Each structure stands twice: as C-alpha cells, then as structure tokens.
C-alpha cells in the first residue's frame, strides 16, 4: 500500500519523506489556508515546491464548482508540474470535468466520495484516483471502512484502473484496516504517521537495552 501525506506543511512533508515511506501528497484549500497562503501566485509556488521536494503525485484542488471553470482551473494546475494531480469534487459538474480532463491526459483525484455508486461513476468518468472519506462517515455513525470494502469489490469486478485513496484518516486503525482490505493508498496526517511508528513496548525495550548496556560499560571501567 502506498502512503501519501495529507498536509501542505513543508516541514511535515520533508520529515515524512526522510523516513523513506512517502509516495505522494494530498492538499486541499483548508490545508493551504492553514499555511498562510493568501494568493494564487503563492499557492502555485507552494505546490511547485512540494512537487520538487518529493517527485511524486501531489494533489491540488480546483475550487470552481462549474464544469467549464473546473477544466480551465485544472489545466492551469496541471501546468505547474507533471506530478500535479487535480482534485475534483464528486458532483455532476465534477464528473463532466473529469471526463474532459481524462481525455486530455490530466490526472484527477475525485474527492468527497461517500458512497460506492459515487466511486463507480467517478471511475467510469476516467478518474485517476478516488478519495472515500472514511473519518467523516465514522463521525456520523456510518462505517467508513465498509465503504472502502464495497468500492474495492466493485473495482475488482470490472477491472477499473482507478486507484483508491483512503482519505479522512483519523487514527492508526484506519490505516491498518485500509491495508488489510487492500486499498491502493492511504493519505495520512503527519500526526498519524508519527503514531504508526510508535509502540509502548518498543519504547520500553529500547530503554531496557540502554540500561543493560550501561551496566556493561560500567563493568569495563
């Protein structure tokens, strides 16, 4: 399974990249705003910097809601760097845009997917990736990972090449469940990536080894 990081923070991206586990980045308007980016020029520069850092897929979102405007915006985003993947919302206009962009060879990530039928429509329209939001479904007492399982079954039935990005990941259990189901990708906040690497027994083991080694060193003196 591939790991993307869900952030626009350069320090977080650099740190995750240094671990040797990073396969891509996803951003959204909220994450961009969190970095204090206030104009189009700075946004373009920021996305280009991320692409140069990791040389891997970087999702940048089109904020238009009309299909024609989405297409124009997507072309502009795709021109930033060959690694840019354009995030398109799962709407009727979004599907129209995805179809056209697919024909032009522009990679797309259909976001805000909450049902298997939405995922099916996005795949048929030619989406490169689809992003089911598991955490938001869990928030309303639905089963986010069940959605992923249903999408995987449908895509397997019809051999769709569209990859599934498990999004809205809130904790390590979401990542574990995604991996067990066979999802292509999980896009993970930096905090959760950090949690994946830790276990209290590992920490205790390291501490014990160090204490035992100190005893050996003292005996040698």
Curated annotation (Swiss-Prot):
Keywords of this entry: Cytoplasm, Pentose shunt, Schiff base, Transferase
EC numbers: 2.2.1.2
Gene Ontology biological process: carbohydrate metabolic process; pentose-phosphate shunt
SUPFAM superfamilies in the record: Aldolase (SSF51569)
Catalytic activity: D-sedoheptulose 7-phosphate + D-glyceraldehyde 3-phosphate = D-erythrose 4-phosphate + beta-D-fructose 6-phosphate
Residues the record marks as active site: 87
Pfam families reported for this sequence: TAL_FSA
Job description of the protein: Transaldolase is important for the balance of metabolites in the pentose-phosphate pathway.
Family: Belongs to the transaldolase family. Type 3B subfamily.
Protein name, entry field: Probable transaldolase
Gene: tal
């Amino acid at each position: 399974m591939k790991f993307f990081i869900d952030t626009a923070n350069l320090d977080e991206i650099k740190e995750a990249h240094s671990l040797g586990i990073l396969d891509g980045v996803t951003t959204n308007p909220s994450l961009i705003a969190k970095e204090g980016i206030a104009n189009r020029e700075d946004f373009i520069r920021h996305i280009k910097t991320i692409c140069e850092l990791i040389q891997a897929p970087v999702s940048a979102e089109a904020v238009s809601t009309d299909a024609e405007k989405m297409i124009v915006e997507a072309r502009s985003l795709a021109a930033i760097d060959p690694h840019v993947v354009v995030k398109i919302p799962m709407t009727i206009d979004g599907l129209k845009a995805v179809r056209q962009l697919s024909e032009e060879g522009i990679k797309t990530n259909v976001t805000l997917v909450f049902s298997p039928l939405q995922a099916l429509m996005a795949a048929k329209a030619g989406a490169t990736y689809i992003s089911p939001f598991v955490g938001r479904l869990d928030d309303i007492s639905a089963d986010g990972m069940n959605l992923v399982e249903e999408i995987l079954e449908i895509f397997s039935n019809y051999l769709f090449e569209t990859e599934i990005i498990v999004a809205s990941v809130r904790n390590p259990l979401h990542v574990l469940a995604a991996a067990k189901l066979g999802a292509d990708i999980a896009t993970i906040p930096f905090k959760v990536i950090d949690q994946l690497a830790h276990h209290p027994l590992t920490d205790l083991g390291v501490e014990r080894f160090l204490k035992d080694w100190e005893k050996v060193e003292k005996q040698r003196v």
